[in-house]
C-alpha cells in the first residue's frame, strides 16, 4: 500500500520550471560633448605713465625726482683723423660740445644709470661744463680739473661734502682699458652705471632733487619741426678752435647723425651712429687762451644770446637765456614763445659768433 503511494507520486505530472529572472539591460552612458578649452585672457600691457624729463619720452619709471648724471668725455682724434673711441654716446639723453684749449670736449647727461654700459674716455672738467651740469642739478663725474674748473667747483660748492663732484679714477669708480680701441692710460678712463651707483652709496650722494617738480626748462612735442623754418638737411658747426662737427638729417632714423673729422660719429659700445632729434647751436662770448695753459672761458649763465634750433630737417633762429648758476637754460622760438623740442635726444653746442658759428642748407 505504501509502495503504491510512492509509485503514484512518481507518476504525477512534471512541474513547470520557474521562469528565469530577466538580465538587466546595460545602462547606456551618454558620450560627453567635448569641452572647449577656454582662451586665456590676455594680460593688458601697462601703458607708460611717466615722462623722461630730459627726452620727453614715455617711460615706466618716475624720474621726476631723480638727479641726472653728467660725465665729462674726451672728443678728439689721432693724427690720421681716426676718432678716439667714445663709449656711452647712445645711452646719453643730452650731449654737450664746447671747446677746451685747441679741441672740444663732450659732456654726456644720463637720466638713468641702471644698465649703463662703459662710459669712456673720461677726462677733466672745465668751469663752463660744471655750470651746465648745475643747470640740471646733476651729479658731475670727471677725471681731473683745470685750475679754473677747480676754483669754480669749489666756489659753487660742488665738492665731496655734498658728494656732487665725483672724481673718477682707479681708486674710486673708474678703471682703465689698455687694449684697442681704448689706447692706454690717457684715453681709457672708464666707468659704468653699476660702479657709479656703488660710489654714490659709499659717499652718501644725494640722488634726488631737493625740491619737488624740478624744472629743467625743457618742453617737448611730438612734432617739433619749425613750421616756417628753412631747409636744413645738413649743417656744419665750426668752433673757435676750428674743430668742425657736421650733421645730416636721416629721415629713416628721424634725427641728425654726425660726422667728425670726416668719420661717422659712433658709440664704440655698439659700433653704430646716433641720431639726435634736436640740435641746438647757442652763441656765447668765448675767450680763448685766458692763461698759460690756453684755457677758455664761455658764458653759460647770467647771460642771454641768439642761436639756432634744428629738427626734422628744418632750422629756426632762437634765443636762449639763463639766470643764476643753479637755474635752468631757457629757450625761445622766433615768435617769443617757449621752444618746443622734439621727443628724443638733444645735442647742444656753444659757439662764438665771431670765431666760427653754424651754416646749413
Language model segments and positions:
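C-terminal motif of bacterial Sec signal peptides marking the signal peptidase cleavage site
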Residues: 7-10
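A surface/extracellular/periplasmic glyco- and lipid-processing/surface-interacting theme
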Residues: 46-92, 96, 101-361
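Ser/Thr-rich, Proline-interspersed low-complexity disordered segments
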Residues: 12-47
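Sec-dependent N-terminal signal peptides
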Residues: 1-3
Amino acid at each position: 500500500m505504501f509502495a503504491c503511494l510512492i509509485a503514484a507520486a512518481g507518476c504525477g505530472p512534471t512541474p513547470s520550471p520557474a521562469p528565469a529572472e530577466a538580465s538587466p539591460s546595460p545602462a547606456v552612458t551618454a558620450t560627453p560633448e567635448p569641452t572647449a578649452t577656454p582662451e586665456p585672457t590676455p594680460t593688458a600691457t601697462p601703458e607708460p605713465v611717466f615722462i623722461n624729463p630730459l627726452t620727453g619720452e614715455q617711460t615706466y619709471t618716475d624720474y621726476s625726482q631723480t638727479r641726472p648724471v653728467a660725465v665729462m668725455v674726451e672728443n678728439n682724434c689721432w693724427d690720421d683723423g681716426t676718432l678716439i673711441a667714445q663709449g656711452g654716446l647712445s645711452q646719453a639723453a643730452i650731449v654737450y660740445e664746447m671747446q677746451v684749449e685747441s679741441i672740444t670736449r663732450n659732456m654726456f647727461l644720463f637720466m638713468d644709470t641702471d644698465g649703463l654700459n662703459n662710459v669712456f674716455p673720461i677726462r677733466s672738467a672745465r668751469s663752463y661744463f660744471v655750470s651746465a651740469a648745475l643747470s640740471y642739478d646733476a651729479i658731475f663725474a670727471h677725471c681731473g680739473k683745470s685750475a679754473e674748473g677747480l676754483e669754480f667747483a669749489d666756489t659753487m660748492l660742488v665738492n665731496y661734502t655734498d658728494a656732487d663732484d665725483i672724481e673718477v679714477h682707479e681708486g674710486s669708480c673708474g678703471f682703465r682699458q689698455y687694449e684697442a680701441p681704448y689706447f692706454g692710460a690717457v684715453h681709457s678712463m672708464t666707468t659704468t652705471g653699476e660702479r657709479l651707483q656703488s660710489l654714490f652709496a659709499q659717499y652718501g650722494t644725494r640722488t634726488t632733487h631737493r625740491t619737488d617738480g624740478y624744472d629743467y626748462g625743457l618742453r617737448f612735442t611730438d612734432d617739433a619741426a619749425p613750421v616756417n623754418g628753412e631747409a636744413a638737411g645738413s649743417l656744419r658747426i665750426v668752433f673757435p678752435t676750428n674743430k668742425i662737427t657736421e650733421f645730416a638729417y636721416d629721415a629713416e632714423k628721424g634725427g641728425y647723425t654726425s660726422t667728425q673729422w670726416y668719420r661717422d660719429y659712433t658709440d664704440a659700445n655698439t659700433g653704430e651712429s646716433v641720431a639726435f632729434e634736436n640740435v641746438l647751436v647757442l652763441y656765447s662770448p668765448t675767450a680763448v687762451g685766458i692763461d698759460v695753459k690756453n684755457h677758455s672761458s664761455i658764458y653759460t649763465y647770467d647771460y642771454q644770446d641768439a642761436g639756432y634750433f634744428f629738427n626734422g630737417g628744418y632750422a629756426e633762429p632762437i634765443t636762449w637765456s639763463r639766470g643764476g648758476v643753479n637755474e635752468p637754460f631757457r629757450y625761445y622760438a622766433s615768435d617769443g614763445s617757449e621752444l618746443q623740442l622734439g621727443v628724443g635726444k638733444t645735442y647742444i653746442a656753444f659757439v662764438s659768433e665771431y670765431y666760427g658759428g653754424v651754416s646749413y642748407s
